């Protein structure tokens, strides 16, 4: 993990963002880092990988980790996502707990707080997300609700990642509270692998075009990437669990998969800075979320 011995006085830290699905963690990390690192969607449980962004200042570095939303899993796939988050928490020294201002604190939030407490004595920062969606009075009620939790938060910071409201303040809070190491832990611009980023771009575009029932059953695997001087050739598989879902992904006359391919290709071209030839194949693997052998081979290994 450590990439170099630091000069005298260098400080660094790791903060992991946690919260229920769809509370704004991915939009937040993209805003904090200033890049599109993590997939965003209005559909829950969008993040399926551990995404890390790095913020550097003079003699200091913060690594921010985005995690899949913590939930009570019903399948081996859901269990695997929770295990990813637990591993990320174990490697952290501070936790950013995301609480959307427009949703009441419920059993899911308390489940997460209990899980965090069970893993270790972390310094906790409450991040009130999506404040652009409510009036000031509602924000004050949310802050009172957080106070009633009785948690020993190091700070409570309301933000709007979408409109970049108080994002710089949140960075300041991170640097004030999360610097526990004396070494540089990561390269300044560390990102997920190219293959992972491409698969996430494809899945993001697919989520924008598909019906509500499909997202949880959709998995994207980049099988092959070939490059020459002028173009990148990419072959990716889109896995679903039922033939009926495959028909939805394909669409009438293949229109939906064509639109997914076009929007994905444009996004990948912007990301890579090259022309892209994209081949998408839709495959059915029955109940893949429950297949430990499939998940181990394709996704969670």
Curated annotation (Swiss-Prot):
This protein's major location comes to: cytoplasm
Q: Name one Pfam family in it.
A: KH_2
Is Electron transport there in the keyword field? no
Q: Which UniProt keywords apply?
A: Cell membrane, Cytoplasm, GTP-binding, Membrane, Nucleotide-binding, Ribosome biogenesis, RNA-binding, rRNA-binding
Q: Where is the Era-type G domain?
A: 11-180
Give any GO molecular function from the UniProt entry.
small ribosomal subunit rRNA binding
Q: Where is this region: G1?
A: 19-26
Q: Which PROSITE patterns does this chain map to?
A: G_ERA, KH_TYPE_2
**InterPro entries attached here?**
G_ERA_dom (IPR030388), GTP-bd (IPR006073), GTPase_Era-like (IPR005662), KH_dom-like_a/b (IPR015946), KH_dom_type_2 (IPR004044), KH_sf_prok-type (IPR009019), P-loop_NTPase (IPR027417), Small_GTP-bd (IPR005225)
Annotated binding of GTP, by residue:
19-26, 66-70, 129-132
Compartments (UniProt record): Cytoplasm; Cell membrane
Q: Topology relative to the membrane, per the entry?
A: Peripheral membrane protein
Keyword Transmembrane listed: no
Any one GO CC term of this protein is: plasma membrane
Looking at the record, which segments are called G4?
A: 129-132
* Domain annotation KH type-2: ranges: 210-286
Instruction: Tell me the function of this protein.
Output: An essential GTPase that binds both GDP and GTP, with rapid nucleotide exchange. Plays a role in 16S rRNA processing and 30S ribosomal subunit biogenesis and possibly also in cell cycle regulation and energy metabolism.
Please state which protein family the record places this protein in. Belongs to the TRAFAC class TrmE-Era-EngA-EngB-Septin-like GTPase superfamily. Era GTPase family.
Task: Give the record's subunit note.
Answer: Monomer.
Show the PANTHER family listed in the entry. GTPASE ERA (PTHR42698), GTPASE ERA, MITOCHONDRIAL (PTHR42698:SF1)
Q: What is this protein called?
A: GTPase Era
Q: Which organism is it from?
A: Tropheryma whipplei (strain Twist)
Specify the taxonomic lineage. Answer: Bacteria, Bacillati, Actinomycetota, Actinomycetes, Micrococcales
């Amino acid at each position: 993990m450590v990439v170099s011995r630091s000069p005298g006085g260098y400080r660094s830290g790791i903060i992991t963002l946690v919260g229920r699905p769809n509370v704004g963690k991915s939009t937040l990390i993209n805003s904090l880092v200033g890049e599109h690192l993590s997939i965003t969607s209005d559909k829950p449980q969008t993040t399926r990988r551990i995404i890390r962004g790095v913020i550097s200042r003079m003699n200091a570095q913060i690594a921010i980790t985005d995690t899949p939303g913590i939930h009570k899993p019903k399948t081996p796939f859901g269990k695997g996502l929770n295990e990813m988050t637990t591993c990320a928490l174990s490697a952290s020294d501070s936790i950013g707990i995301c609480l959307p201002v427009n949703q009441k604190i419920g059993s899911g939030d308390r489940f997460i707080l209990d899980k965090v407490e069970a893993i270790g004595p972390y310094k906790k920062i409450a991040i009130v997300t999506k404040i652009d969606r409510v009036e000031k009075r509602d924000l004050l009620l949310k802050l009172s609700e957080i106070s009633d939790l009785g948690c020993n938060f190091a700070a409570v910071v309301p933000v709007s990642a979408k409109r970049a409201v108080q994002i710089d303040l949140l960075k300041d809070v991170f640097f004030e509270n999360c610097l526990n190491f004396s070494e540089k832990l990561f390269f300044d611009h560390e990102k997920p692998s190219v293959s992972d980023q491409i698969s996430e771009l494809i899945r993001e575009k697919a989520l924008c075009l598909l019906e509500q029932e499909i997202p949880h059953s959709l998995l994207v695997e980049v099988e092959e990437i070939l490059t020459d001087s002028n173009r990148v050739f990419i072959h990716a598989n889109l896995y679903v669990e039922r033939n009926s879902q495959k028909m939805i992904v394909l669409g009438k006359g293949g229109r939906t998969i064509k639109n997914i391919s076009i929007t994905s290709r444009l996004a990948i071209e912007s990301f890579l800075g090259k022309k892209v030839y994209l081949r998408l194949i839709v495959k059915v693997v029955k109940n893949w979320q429950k297949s430990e052998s499939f998940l181990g081979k394709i996704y969670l290994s």
